[in-house]
Amino acid sequence: MPRLKVTQVRSGIGGTAEQRDTLRSLGLKRLRDTVVKEDRPEIRGMIRAVAHLVRVEEVE
């Protein structure tokens, strides 16, 4: 199954509480934090909600 490398590139400060909670749910706590997640619809939805704060790459 493909995986997604998600890196936080912008701060959650100034965003809504929902956006900050979504970053935390993805496992991102500070700038330049990177996590690798399975490519699933739930994860894609969370990424879409904070797309302006993260960078996403597909990895094998």
Curated annotation (Swiss-Prot):
Protein's UniProt keywords contain Ribosomal protein: yes
Claim: Ribosomal protein is one of the keywords in the record: yes
Pfam families: Ribosomal_L30 (PF00327)
A GO MF term: structural constituent of ribosome
Family to which this protein belongs: Belongs to the universal ribosomal protein uL30 family.
Subunit organization: Part of the 50S ribosomal subunit.
Protein name in UniProt: Large ribosomal subunit protein uL30
Originating organism: Acidothermus cellulolyticus (strain ATCC 43068 / DSM 8971 / 11B)
